[in-house]
Each structure stands twice: as structure tokens, then as C-alpha cells.
Amino acid sequence: MGITRRLFMPLVAVMVICCHDCGAQDFLFKVMAVHGRVEVKGLDGAVMPAKVGFSLQEGMTLITSENSYVALLYKTGNVMEVKGRANHLVRDLVEKLPQAKTGVTTRLVNFAISRINEVNEDPETNYKENLRAAAGVERALNGEIKVLLKYQDKSNIFYENQVMIEWLPEEKADSYEVVITDVFSEELYKTTTTNSFQIIDLEQAGIADIRMFLVKVISNTGISSRLFRLERSDDDSINEQILVDHTGKSAGEEVMLALFFEERGLYVDALKYYQQAAQISPDVNIYSVLKDHFITTQELGN
């Protein structure tokens, strides 16, 4: 059995709390993600599958099997990941958690309920295939790579120094150049990758002090994207609202951050954390579904 704990600030803490059995006030945990065989022994002794959004109460038992995974959100803001075969009394899981801070915002709760419900209502929707189809249309109509950012008169506001640029891959391309310029078209940074995304550390690139810049992606086959404008957020209070202990090792933790940034319109930061969640736990389908749903819902690339 392996258990990982992380402490979140209150604004992030309640994102998935109300997505199932919202009327129940005595739950201790909500199920965020499940992989493999995970069951719950209820208060009446009945055993049922653990599903995303399920409420865990004090008298229940969480039953995990070999190679299983479940991410749990405690009602006051802690995220716990449980792995391996064991029976866990819910009350004992609570005792393993550090003290969490309290306080919620109605806006964020409503946003979280809406997001989780949208994904759960139509789980068969293949967001990734829809995105690929959209990329084909983009290429056919405009001869362009589809970068997952906002275009036209909208800036892509970001907060953190590590920025992820992602695009939908070209069928015949083997590599891509990511080029950053200033508003006068002077090149500030360039890198080459064989992936369909690139995380750029602005400090290491020497451009952390530049508040606004332009980015484009060029394939080795000569196909280019549009120019996209990125601009740093001037909200210095964000760091105080995020989380206390972020190690980048917990997929549940990354999703919480993604939702936190998405709710604030910081889509560049949100996309990075959705991507990292999917990479940390590639076998847990809901993390990649949440990422693709986010891209589709926020119309990134348009």
C-alpha cells in the first residue's frame, strides 16, 4: 500500500467535493479518480464499485486491489492517493492527513460541479479524436499547425515561469521549432523538439522579465502556425492562493492546480498541469479526458 498526501489551499480544495451526492453533509472524502478494481463497503455492508464523485463516509471501508489506484479529496482540502491491495477504514485514512485550512468560494464550487458533471454525462465522447479532426480542417483550410492557445484579439495570460506550448501533430513532421519573438519580430528564444509540446522555462531562456511576447511553431516540413500572443498576469496574489507543498509527483495534485488556473482564465498554466497529470498517471483515463475536455470547452486553437 502506498499513500501520498498533499495540502491544498481552500480555493482549490473543494473542486470535486460536490459533484456527487451533494446533499450529503457527512462525507469525509470524494473520489477524484479511479483505476483498476476499487470498491467501497457501505454503511449497510453492501460492496459497490468506487466511482468518480462517490462520497466516502466515516463508517465505510475502501477496498483496493493489486495495481489499483484511487485519488481522494478530503473535505477540507487534502488530496490523498491510495495504491495497492488493502482494506482501508475511511476513519483511518483521515488520521493520516495533516491539518487542512478551511474556507470555500461558491464560484469555484459551482465551476467544479459543472466541469465534472460535463465529463461524467458523456463519458464516451472522444475529445482527442475531435481535436485531431479539427486540426485536419485547420491544415486543409489555412495550411497551419493548430496550436492550443487563444488567437485573434485575446491574449494568452499566464502566471508561472514555466510555460507549455502544445500543438496538434502533423502527420509527416518529425520535429518542430518553437520560436519566441518580441512585438517587433526580434527573435528572443528558439528550441527544437520531436514532441508535440514544449515546456519553456522563461528564467532559463532569459526572458522572464518580458511581460508580453509572441510564439509560433514551425514543422520540419515547412508548415507553420499563426503567431500567438502571451502575456504575464499582473495578479501577485495568485501564489498565496495555490498550494503549500507541490512536488509534481501526484496526478491528483496537478489536476487540482489545472482546475484552479482554468477557473481564473489562466489557460496556459492550466494546460500545463492537465498535461502533467496525464503524464504522471497515463493509465488513469479521467486525467486525459479532463485535459481534452478543457481544450475543447475553452476552444484553444481558435
Where are these regions (language model features)?
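Glycine- and acidic-residue-biased ligand/ion/polar-headgroup-sensing regions
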Residues: Q25-G45, T64-V70, K75-N78, G84-A86, ...
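Compositionally biased low-complexity segments at domain edges in trafficked proteins
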Residues: Q99-E118, Q241-Y274
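Short, compositionally biased P/S/T/A/G/V-rich stretches that sit at domain boundaries
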Residues: I113-V163, I238-H246
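Conserved aromatic anchor
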Residues: M164-K172
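Short beta-strand segments within Ig-like beta-sandwich modules, predominantly Fibronectin type-III
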Residues: Y189-N195
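Surface-exposed, short loops/turns at beta-strand junctions within beta-sandwich domains
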Residues: E203-R211
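Structural register within alpha-helical repeat arrays
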Residues: L257, L290-K291
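Alpha-helical linker/edge segments of TPR/alpha-solenoid repeat scaffolds
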Residues: F294-N302
